Amino acid sequence: MLSKQIPLGIYEKALPAGECWLERLQLAKTLGFDFVEMSVDETDERLSRLDWSREQRLALVNAIVETGVRVPSMCLSAHRRFPLGSEDDAVRAQGLEIMRKAIQFAQDVGIRVIQLAGYDVYYQEANNETRRRFRDGLKESVEMASRAQVTLAMEIMDYPLMNSISKALGYAHYLNNPWFQLYPDIGNLSAWDNDVQMELQAGIGHIVAVHVKDTKPGVFKNVPFGEGVVDFERCFETLKQSGYCGPYLIEMWSETAEDPAAEVAKARDWVKARMAKAGMVEAA
């Protein structure tokens, strides 16, 4: 029987940098986490993972089996550099190829959810044409994901196009495909002028995972827990009361800190204390 404990994971970029996944998963286990979320960002180093050999992919699978710590999700932020909404056909084609490779990678190693960045373009000016291309790119991506039985899940972003669950639901309704769902970030959601509790309730039935971090208006990264605007207890209460039973992922960027493990342990204890206050006793 599967445990009723709330699945709590940690973002790869919170842990010491490096390419040894056995060491990373062992550390995550020592720190009390159930899973680690992989990052495939716009750097050449992390993008190269999508070209891993069969042996490299098998090494990741073996590390998961050996440690018992899962890698069920991928944060695919590489589309900042190669956006699906780009008006440059070559750049957009690269974005679609990255999506194809990411879906194949996920299928090979057992990743179930690929979190998408909700940017039509990031470094360029957005317009109606970039949004149209983005929609068409998502449609093509979801078709690929459907064939592979891999879920694509849209993050609620630090960007106006996708800064609320309501906006992301518009894309879910447009695509009308069970392999496209939502992956809200309660930090990003809280940093905008949103009714956070109503937004979370609106997403129930489409939320496959939740990012946990603190933010301030206009500051979306590296805000210490408890120093931002997020009402964690209310968010956890709302999700619990709405029937959400899925995973929570602590998102941090402490991989270059003096002692990443200590930073992560401190954040873990802080988050679990708020979960306990919200009545999520399994996380206490």
Curated annotation (Swiss-Prot):
What are the BP-aspect GO terms? L-ascorbic acid catabolic process
Q: What induces it?
A: Induced by L-ascorbate. Repressed by UlaR.
Keyword annotations? Isomerase
Q: Which reaction does it catalyse?
A: L-ribulose 5-phosphate = L-xylulose 5-phosphate
Q: Can you tell which superkingdom this protein's organism belongs to? A: Bacteria
Q: Does the keyword Isomerase apply?
A: yes
* GO MF assignments: intramolecular oxidoreductase activity, interconverting aldoses and ketoses; L-ribulose-5-phosphate 3-epimerase activity
Q: In which pathway does it act?
A: Cofactor degradation; L-ascorbate degradation; D-xylulose 5-phosphate from L-ascorbate: step 3/4
Give the EC number.
5.1.3.22
The record's InterPro entries line, in alphabetical order, gives: L-Ru-5P_3-Epase, L-Ru-5P_3-Epase_Enterobacteria, Sugar_Epim/Isomerase, Xyl_isomerase-like_sf, Xyl_isomerase-like_TIM-brl
Family of the protein in this entry? Belongs to the L-ribulose-5-phosphate 3-epimerase family.
Q: PANTHER family given for it?
A: ISOMERASE, L-RIBULOSE-5-PHOSPHATE 3-EPIMERASE ULAE
Function text: Catalyzes the isomerization of L-xylulose-5-phosphate to L-ribulose-5-phosphate. Is involved in the anaerobic L-ascorbate utilization.
Name the record gives this protein: L-ribulose-5-phosphate 3-epimerase UlaE
Q: Which organism is it from?
A: Escherichia coli O157:H7
